[in-house]
Structures are given as structure tokens and as C-alpha cells.
């Protein structure tokens, strides 16, 4: 489909328009890449392509907030570049992705960003934006963060509390990054796990002879995620900065987030479709390649209640977004860690299946309605990224990123039919209700009835504005009312004690009532010849009159006498 969106007219007729807050029957007219009209019995010019959506839902295109196309990680390069990755996204009903720029330590953030743009711009099939990773801290990094926000259209930065000696930041560095984010109105995204203890756990597992994929689950227990989640929320709260938790994987971490929100802290959180639908039992599969295919961090959890619990947290807005965290590797690439689980590249696929999997487990599973589905797959992301209502809503004036969704149709997921890269699918043979029939991106039909019709490079970079209201509006007001102020008091004018440090010479004249004694010899031994004790003179009772001498007539015990 090479036609310019300015020349394309589309009428979606007879469907139910679903936004995050309402559902109503309406037709949708699209022209020049923009939704022009929404309603019944629309007056439209001739020549429009008519799409019959009777009995179907018309929803905003999905926004996947975490993808890793053409990224090299743990000595392996993800098998999907920006063309194949965005193609898979569109086939699955996602019309915008957010990629990751992950600079190495001591390297320029701006240069890494420009390299990623050079890879993406000629390849993308849908609109995209970028998060930039903060993997080290220095004044130069802070300056480049400001440049990226003010000149390059970046409004979010990713940090890691794990990946020790690679990407992990210390608490004090996170504190500084959060201050910088708050000042420039950016969103700090954090992968929360206790990296120090994860590293120790990995060493212990290897020492016990555990080398297989189960070592990932063993060395990344959920208590380390919960501890780090609480800690980073505390750090962010101390800096009056919002916090966005990524890859939330456990019940205990979800509970920490829920408690923080109840306390009024500005906390946002996303999980992945893998964590919200699968379990960590796969790590104990007898087939090594099967187990390794599920290796991601944080790992999938053994507790079989976890996935349904996370889906419930998505439904009640404790978790705001479900992303794919798409970073697929082949079995051959995963096999780099066949003798050592710490060398298995972390990453799974999911950009193509995200929407259908969440519909099946969320809506069909009775956890959420179609409006909440739109919220967690599209609208909330648009609001947090400061794109709403241009993206994430079906209204006049919004970008024409629209999906015709069949809630009753079914499909069976398989690696043999997937568009996304990799030779394995986590959801193999999973039967899903909810299928995208038509995907419209930038006002062009790019996928219809199983046929993909889009050339590479037709997507565009979307600059993101800072200070999104949903994130910062409350904090700006709080800072006005909760500003820390010192106490205006009368100065203290009395005496001040002088601190004498051991081993140092006299720092000043001691006060009259300060007890003193001679300096001890080296090694702490007193010199008895230099004792302050004296039989006469310089004694405390010298002023009391004394007799010169006295004769003792009877010693204590009485006088003694001879026996003869």
C-alpha cells in the first residue's frame, strides 16, 4: 500500500466504537490520515473505501510501550529489525511502538539515540518513539538528558537496579537521575530487582552445579523484586518525582505498588503479556531449548496464581499498561548459555500476540471489559507519553490509527505462522478469541483479511512532549503546598564546646571546669612519674588548715604491752 494517506478516504461503517471510558455505535470517517467524523448517518464525500464493521468493535490502535528491535544485548542481536518488528505489531493490531536506546557505560546518550534513529527511520512501518537508557551517571549525562528532552522528542528514561557491573545504578545515582527527570519533566522508568543479591544468588546456584534455565528463576526470587520496588518508590518519593515500574512480575511487587498508590504516591506500572499469562514452570522443562526460550528478567513466576493476579491488577488500575517487552532470540542464540544460565540472552517475543492474548485472558477470562482492554493496551500509554487524545482515542481530530476487532473470531497461535522473528512462540497452540481484521495506520489500510500491505519506512517518529499531565500535574501542585521550609528562630549566643579529636594537638583553651590529665605515652601506657597526684601542693583541699604533725598515743586496736 504505497498511496499517500492524504489521498485515502475510509469509512468504517456499522461498528461499535470503543474508547477507554465508553462504547457506542457509530461510523468513523477518515481522511488525510486523521479521523474526521464519528457518528451515525455521516455526510461524506464520494470515493471512500467502505469497511463493513457490523458486529465488530472499532478500537484505537494498540501502543506497545516496550520493544527492543535491532538491539544487541548480552552479546546477541535481537532477530527482529524495525521493519519486521513493526510489521508484526501491525498484524497484531498495534499501530505504535516505543523502542529502547541502551547506551554502553561511558558513552554518549545523544550519539546512541542518533544511531537508533538512523536504523529505525528507513525501516518502520508504523509510528514510533524512543526511551533512552541511563546506564551511568555524570554531569555529562544530565546535560544530554536535557538535550534529548528539549531537542530530540524524548520524554522517558530507563534505569536498571539489576545487571550488576553492566547497567545497574546505585541508589545515590538513581536519586540524582530522578532529580534530573523531575526538573525537565521526564518519566523515569525503572527495572526493579536487587542486583547485588541477584548476582550473589547466581554465584551460589552455579556453585551448586545448577547451570540450566531454572537458575534464572532460582537467582531472581520475587522478594528481591518486591524489596527493590519498595526502595525505588521511596527514592522517587524523596525527590518528589514520579516513578514508572516496568516488567512487574510478581504478586509481592504488585502489592507494594498497590500500597504506594493507596498512600497517594505517584506510581505508574506496566507488566508484560508473558508475565500476565504464563508461569515459570517452563524453566523446569526437560527440553533445554524449551526452557531457555522462556528466559526473561524478571523471570516468569512459579506461583500459578501470579498471572491471574497480575491480570486483576491490570483490571483495577494498580498496573496501568501491558507491554510485550519484545526481544526475541533464536534457539541458537540462547544456546550461548547452554553451560551457564547467566549467559542465556534475556528476551522473549510477543509484539504480534499481545493484543489477542490480553483479550483472551483479560476480557474472555472475565477480568476486564472492552473499555479497560483499550485502556491497558492503548489509551493509558498515550496519556502517560503525552500523546493523548491524538493517539489512544477514536474522536474527530485524532490520528487515524484504528483497528477493526472481531471479539468472536478465534485463532491458534503458532511459531509456524507468526510474522515476528524467532523460531519459538511462548503461546504455542494457545487458542485466542479476539482477532484484528483490519489495521489502519496513519489513515492507510496496512493489514486486511490476513494480507499485509505496507512498505518499510512509511511510519514516522513521534516526538514526545515533557511534563505529561497524568504524571506531573499532581506533583507540581504538591510541591507548592509541601515545600520544605526552615524554622525562623532566635540565634543561639551561648558557649560552644570545643571538640578535641583523639591523637590531635590541643584545639583551644579548655573551659575551667573541664577535667584534664597528662598525655599518655605511645601505645596508651600512662607514665606514673608524670602523675598528677602529689603529697603537697596543687591539691583540691589545699585551702583547708592543717596541723603540721600529731602524736599517736594509741594505735588502732589499742595499746600493746609486754607479757613479762
Curated annotation (Swiss-Prot):
Detected in brain. It is found in: Cytoplasm. It comes from Mus musculus (Mouse). Involved in the negative regulation of dendrite outgrowth. The modification Omega-N-methylarginine is found at residue 559. This is Dihydropyrimidinase-related protein 5. GO terms for biological process: axon guidance; negative regulation of dendrite morphogenesis. The modification Phosphothreonine is found at residues 509, 514. Belongs to the metallo-dependent hydrolases superfamily. Hydantoinase/dihydropyrimidinase family. One of its GO terms (molecular function) is hydrolase activity, acting on carbon-nitrogen (but not peptide) bonds. It holds the Pfam family Amidohydro_1. The keyword Phosphoprotein applies.
